């Protein structure tokens, strides 16, 4: 297949490398390049605030789109793209690479076959270590970023494991002196329609990479460490391209991803327009210099 990748940052380059290894023709485009439409599908890997506009260009032409997470950053943009795909259906998928992680595939089997009574997801990594070039110039640090949208993988895979969400509440804040405009720490509580409850912790503060899922059962707790691996990205890309080839609707299409995102954007305790400008942390919790 011929695939255009719009946005050639770290995730765009990763997708390009994986696509080439899978034998596909890749056309990488940065923001200042003219869009190409002579392709079989498009990967939208630009900063979050451009996702909807760039995806729209391809959707209106009936070209399948893969959009990196998060789908967008506010309800207005979300409603715009949801309205578009209702009028003009197209094969679409939003990034959900953790659904392809070996540890979470095992968790999926357990969640489907055993009685889970509670779930706890955690993720954290110090932002300057995560965004290694200059974190202050990354989308994470911008008004369109923040740890809640950066860590949308956790609510997404919990939804994938346990189904529709009845209620979602959160507490989020900026507690460090990282030079960012949004929250750097959050606690999210979720109640599913099944009655199961779960919680998520996410932050930009942990100096060592940390990501795990704990599934509580009546007589034991099973923990899943979620270590970085390229395997999940390759499987994600192959899955999407198989759907394009077979003209099959992928999981986590725009409608499904929009459902989870809307729960977060509308969740009690989260204000997507709030910026933590010029806030600094107390001296005793500032990070090491």
Predicted stretch roles:
Residues 61-63, 88-91, 196:
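A short helix->loop->beta-strand "cap" motif at the edges of active sites that frequently abuts
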Residues 98-168, 176-179:
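Predominantly a Rossmann-like dinucleotide-binding segment in NAD(P)-dependent oxidoreductases
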Residues 15, 32-84, 287-288:
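Beta-loop-alpha module in the N-terminal Rossmann-like domain of NAD(P)-dependent dehydrogenases
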Residues 20, 32, 41-46, 193, ...:
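C-terminal helix-rich "cap/oligomerization" subdomain common to oxidoreductases
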Residues 80-97, 115-119:
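Rossmann-fold dehydrogenase core element
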Residues 1-37:
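N-terminal Rossmann-like dinucleotide-binding module
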Residues 177-186, 191-242, 250-251:
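NAD(P)-dinucleotide binding in Rossmann-like oxidoreductases
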């Amino acid at each position: 297949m011929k695939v255009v990748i719009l946005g050639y940052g770290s995730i765009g380059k990763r997708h390009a490398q994986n696509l080439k290894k899978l034998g596909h023709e890749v056309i990488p485009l940065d923001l200042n390049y003219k869009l190409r439409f002579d392709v079989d599908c498009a990967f939208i890997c630009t900063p979050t605030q451009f996702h909807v506009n760039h995806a729209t260009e391809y959707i209106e032409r009936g070209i399948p789109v893969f959009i990196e997470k998060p789908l967008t950053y506010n309800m207005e943009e979300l409603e715009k793209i949801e309205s578009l795909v209702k009028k003009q259906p197209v094969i679409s998928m939003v990034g959900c690479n953790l659904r392809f992680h070996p540890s979470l595939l095992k968790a999926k089997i357990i969640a489907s076959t055993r009685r889970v009574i509670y779930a706890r997801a955690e993720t954290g990594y110090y932002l300057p270590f995560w965004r290694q070039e200059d974190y202050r110039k990354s989308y994470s640090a911008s008004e369109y970023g923040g740890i809640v949208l950066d860590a949308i993988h956790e609510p997404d895979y919990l939804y994938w494991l346990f189904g529709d969400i009845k209620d979602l509440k959160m507490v989020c804040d900026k507690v460090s002196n990282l030079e960012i405009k949004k929250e750097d720490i959050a606690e999210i509580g979720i109640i599913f329609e099944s009655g199961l409850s779960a919680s998520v912790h996410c932050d930009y503060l942990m100096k060592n990479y940390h990501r795990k899922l704990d599934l509580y059962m009546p007589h034991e707790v099973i923990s899943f460490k979620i270590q970085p691996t390229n395997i999940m990205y390759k499987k994600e890309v192959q899955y999407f391209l198989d759907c394009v080839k077979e003209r099959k609707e992928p999981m986590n299409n725009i409608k499904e991803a929009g459902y989870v995102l809307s729960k977060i954007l509308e969740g009690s305790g989260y204000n997507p327009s709030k910026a933590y400008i010029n806030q600094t942390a107390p001296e005793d919790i500032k990070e090491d210099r």
